[in-house]
């Protein structure tokens, strides 16, 4: 439901005629709901909240989360070690979506600077 990831991602996918289900903290039996999806975009804001009970073979998992774990290392919202062997594809954290986000932000900064200089 967040304005940063949840709503924009849902709107983008709906415009492409995807059937979208949005889960949140009040979703009943979330693991069962998530297992039904072919593509799962995770932006929960909690390290490792999505584990192997949420997934099945054939899924693509896009982990947007950026967290610091107990050891001080960056990690996502998905428990990569448990989920990775089950699903068909998963984005890593670090090195996944964050790299794309940085590139897009740099592009926007350059575009804004060019507009400001005119």
PLM features: what roles do these ranges have?
Residues 62-117:
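Rossmann-fold NAD(P)-binding glycine/threonine-rich loop
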Residues 1-60, 73-81:
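Glycine-rich phosphate/diphosphate-binding loop of Rossmann-like nucleotide-binding domains
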């Amino acid at each position: 439901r967040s304005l940063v990831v949840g709503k924009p991602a849902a709107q983008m996918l709906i415009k492409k005629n995807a059937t979208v289900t949005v889960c949140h903290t009040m979703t009943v039996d979330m693991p069962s709901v998530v297992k039904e999806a072919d593509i799962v975009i995770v932006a929960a804001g909690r390290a490792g909240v999505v584990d192997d009970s949420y997934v099945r073979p054939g899924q693509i998992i896009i982990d947007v989360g950026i967290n610091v774990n107990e050891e001080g290392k960056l990690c996502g919202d998905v428990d990569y070690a448990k989920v990775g062997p089950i699903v068909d594809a998963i984005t890593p954290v670090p090195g996944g979506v964050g790299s794309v986000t940085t590139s897009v932000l740099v592009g926007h900064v350059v575009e804004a600077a060019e507009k400001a200089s005119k």
